[in-house]
Amino acid sequence: MNIHFKGTGVAVTTPFNGQTIDYNLFEDHLNFLINNNVEALIINGTTGEGSTLTEDEKLKTIEIAVRVAHGRVPVIAGTGTNNTQATIEHSLKAKALGVDSIMLITPYYNKTNQRGLLAHFTTIADAVELPVLLYNVPARTNMTIEQETVAALAEHPYIYGIKDATGDINYMKTLKSVVPDDFALYSGNDDAVLPFYEAGGDGVISVIANAIPAEFSDIYRTYQVNRHEAERQFNNLLPLINALSVDVNPIPIKALVAYIGYANGELRLPLVPMLEQDTKQLIELYNRIAKGSDLS
């Protein structure tokens, strides 16, 4: 399995039914995504509400995703926490279930320094011996992996890439200049994919692709042969992408995924549903795209 995918991976939502996960809907959604040409599944991350899943629930979603993917696309599980040893223990359980890669967020709350980040990620990679995707999302963790630290981590045989959700293209450009050519660089921001691709990025770990996987994943493939057409495709989807910013992720995308039938619209506290008027506007934009209207 080549875990260094090119194109669109999906940060998959987790459907709830009361106090439990609706595993049938989860499986249906995974098949929908794979059948609509996404290149990777990323589960139990921010968009999957991984921070409010129990360990048993996380392991069950991993088990299902590995079975459903069946080698068609890589499955990457968010296993990172701010507890190094707990992350190792959970990651080893994920490895035993056959996950292709783990995604490790920077430690949060017990904020460390760059030397601490280097030790944290290296210790986990050494212990788990599974491909590691770093996750840089300072807006949520108040911790940035500096480019020099990423470059040092890139020398580790199991650390193969990073999901960067800063939205800062200059950060990515500098990073590109200090890491090996085969180090994977993924955007965590749907609204920044074109400049990210122009700067040499390998793909995106997308939120909007939960609802429009075929349309959004086609942008990367089109970009390889016709940049102007890719820009047109992107601009047509941009109003819907921007509409997801009306509330905190994953609140808006879960409303949209519920509308297309792969969730029940439920969130786990402290997340609460969107305002009705915002949901209505989001669905109207989606329906216009579904009907082939040009929103650009």
Swiss-Prot record:
UniProt binding sites for pyruvate: 47, 205
Main location: cytoplasm
UniProt keyword annotations, A-Z: Amino-acid biosynthesis, Cytoplasm, Diaminopimelate biosynthesis, Lyase, Lysine biosynthesis, Schiff base
Recorded superkingdom: Bacteria
GO biological process: diaminopimelate biosynthetic process; lysine biosynthetic process via diaminopimelate
Location in or out of the cell: Cytoplasm
Catalytic-site annotation from UniProt: 135 (proton donor/acceptor), 163 (schiff-base intermediate with substrate)
Gene3D superfamilies named in the record: Aldolase class I (3.20.20.70)
Identification of the protein by name: 4-hydroxy-tetrahydrodipicolinate synthase
GO molecular function: 4-hydroxy-tetrahydrodipicolinate synthase activity
The UniProt record lists the keyword Lyase: yes
PROSITE patterns hit by this protein: DHDPS_1, DHDPS_2
Biological source species: Macrococcus caseolyticus (strain JCSC5402) (Macrococcoides caseolyticum)
Pathway note: Amino-acid biosynthesis; L-lysine biosynthesis via DAP pathway; (S)-tetrahydrodipicolinate from L-aspartate: step 3/4
Family: Belongs to the DapA family.
E.C. code: 4.3.3.7
Reaction(s) catalysed by this chain's protein: L-aspartate 4-semialdehyde + pyruvate = (2S,4S)-4-hydroxy-2,3,4,5-tetrahydrodipicolinate + H2O + H(+)
Subunit structure: Homotetramer; dimer of dimers.
Record-annotated site: Part of a proton relay during catalysis: 46, 109
Function per UniProt: Catalyzes the condensation of (S)-aspartate-beta-semialdehyde [(S)-ASA] and pyruvate to 4-hydroxy-tetrahydrodipicolinate (HTPA).
GO cellular component, as recorded: cytosol
SMART domains linked: DHDPS
Family annotation (InterPro entries): Aldolase_TIM, DapA, DapA-like, Schiff_base-form_aldolases_AS, Schiff_base-form_aldolases_CS
The keyword Translocase is assigned to this record: no
PANTHER family associated with the record: 4-HYDROXY-2-OXOGLUTARATE ALDOLASE, MITOCHONDRIAL, DIHYDRODIPICOLINATE SYNTHASE
SUPFAM superfamilies according to UniProt: Aldolase
EC category: lyase
